[in-house]
Amino acid sequence: MAVIGAPKGHDRYRDPKTHQMTPALYRVRAPFFWKNTIGLAICTAIPLGVYMYTLHMLSKDEFGDIPIPPISDTELTKLKKEYEASKNQN
């Protein structure tokens, strides 16, 4: 089977001993640095903008117009007992 790529032990973009980037790899990546940085800024700004818009719209929302259904006193005491029992178990 044929081996694809550089010969074993030979990598022109990484130092074989330290595995650090060589100057050749820095030169190859240099033209793409600013384009990638701009792309990262755009890809970060879109979800951040959606999040900030959603947070802004939710902070203005009033929940006072939503009616709360009435609860009877017996049902309230039953729920309190269930809550206390679950709190004591933890």
From Swiss-Prot:
Annotated localization: Mitochondrion inner membrane
TM region positions: 32-54
Mitochondrial matrix side: 1-31
Keyword Amino-acid biosynthesis listed: no
Pfam families named in the record: Coa3_cc
Biological processes per GO annotation: mitochondrial cytochrome c oxidase assembly
Residue ranges of coiled coil: none
Keywords noted in UniProt: Membrane, Mitochondrion, Mitochondrion inner membrane, Transmembrane, Transmembrane helix
Membrane-protein topology: Single-pass membrane protein
Claim: Lipoprotein is one of the keywords in the record: no
Job description of the protein: Required for assembly of cytochrome c oxidase (complex IV).
Subunit structure: Component of 250-400 kDa complexes called cytochrome oxidase assembly intermediates or COA complexes.
Protein name: Cytochrome c oxidase assembly factor 3, mitochondrial
Biological source species: Scheffersomyces stipitis (strain ATCC 58785 / CBS 6054 / NBRC 10063 / NRRL Y-11545) (Yeast)
